Curated annotation (Swiss-Prot):
It comes from Zoarces viviparus (Viviparous eelpout). The lineage of its organism: Eukaryota, Metazoa, Chordata, Craniata, Vertebrata. Transmembrane segments: none annotated. Belongs to the metallothionein superfamily. Type 1 family. The gene is mt. This is Metallothionein. Keywords: Metal-binding, Metal-thiolate cluster.
Length: 60
């Protein structure tokens, strides 16, 4: 099974090798599913991604 179903379902099974593209998941940790831009100071390590822009709506 593909460990990363983000592009199909909007959710991820966060396996150690999960690499998401076109991420729309709301349950994945940033380390698994990099929704937020790298270097985004508002996206703390371990946050749950909600968006692709570096602002307060990026992560919950």
């Amino acid at each position: 099974m593909d460990p990363c179903e983000c592009s199909k379902t909007g959710t991820c099974n966060c396996g150690g090798s999960c690499k998401c593209t076109n991420c729309s998941c709301t349950t994945c940790k940033k380390s698994c599913c990099p929704c937020c831009p790298s270097g985004c100071t508002k996206c703390a390590s371990g946050c749950v991604c909600k968006g692709k822009t570096c602002d307060t709506s990026c992560c919950q």
